[in-house]
């Protein structure tokens, strides 16, 4: 049995398979998941697991080069935006329109769906390298 890091076998496999600049998405329970993109559905009820809890576990186990969020999060969910910025202090941040954000999800290796039910609690993580 695995002792550290991500215990979810699907998430661990996706993280292990990422190459430089590949992307994964951590999403609230309302973000549309495009056809053809791997869905890892963790949602068990509204709010569980939370977006921030899942983000923290994934971020602890992933080399992240860039973080992308919808610019709407700045006004519509300032608390989540602030927490993401505080937890992920090293990668570059990019804000795009929610429409553009959804277009970028079509190229993700996987979308991890949480139980989060607050607006724009979604992030695209671009894989970095460990050297």
UniProtKB/Swiss-Prot annotation:
It comes from the Bacteria. GO terms for molecular function: D-ribose pyranase activity; intramolecular lyase activity; monosaccharide binding. It catalyses: beta-D-ribopyranose = beta-D-ribofuranose. Keywords: Carbohydrate metabolism, Cytoplasm, Isomerase. Its main location: cytoplasm. Disulfide bonds: none annotated. It is found in: Cytoplasm. InterPro entries: D-ribose_pyranase (IPR023064), RbsD-like_sf (IPR023750), RbsD_FucU (IPR007721). Pathway: Carbohydrate metabolism; D-ribose degradation; D-ribose 5-phosphate from beta-D-ribopyranose: step 1/2. GO terms for cellular component: cytosol. GO terms for biological process: D-ribose catabolic process. Belongs to the RbsD / FucU family. RbsD subfamily. Catalyzes the interconversion of beta-pyran and beta-furan forms of D-ribose. This is D-ribose pyranase.
